[in-house]
Amino acid sequence: MFARTVVVVCLFGLIAFGDNCRAQSDDVRSKQRFPSTYLYSVLNGQKGDKTTFRDSSGRAQGSATQSGSRISFRDGLGRAIGSAETSGSKTTFRDGSGSTIETATTNGERTTFRSSNGSNLGSASQARNNTTFRDSSGRSIGSAANSGNRTTFRDSSGRSSGSASSNRR
């Protein structure tokens, strides 16, 4: 069920795209209600029940725990900050109060992200073990490369900006 879906990759503006997360427009950020969080990702290859996100210095920034079709997200201090649930090709992200804040719809190798009001937030395209992320204008803003249960994130300049590792509980 999760072969093509799910992992939030930008917790607290540090994971996945570094400053690119913080550089998103106020309009986009206003639609996100996770604390300082920009939900961007769809990732192939995260096989574990729990995924831990780290910044480029190796510091833990948060986690995602999978249970069936639902994933629960926690920040770096272990506090619950929201969830994601997949049904068919669509993943719905909710904040801690249960309000929908974003959706991700997968069509083949491409996933499109939209805010709760339908605005285009960007996309992710997969090719083998690599995922490229683009903003709503189609500009590349980062990438992710999978190797086993570990994923390395890079910003648009190719600099390492974090990682994710999955382990079965």
For each of these PLM feature ranges, what is it?
Residues 1-7:
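Bacterial N-terminal signal peptides that target proteins for export
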Residues 17-23:
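Sec/Tat signal peptide C-region and signal peptidase I cleavage site
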Residues 25-169:
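Repetitive, compositionally biased segments used for assembly/scaffolding
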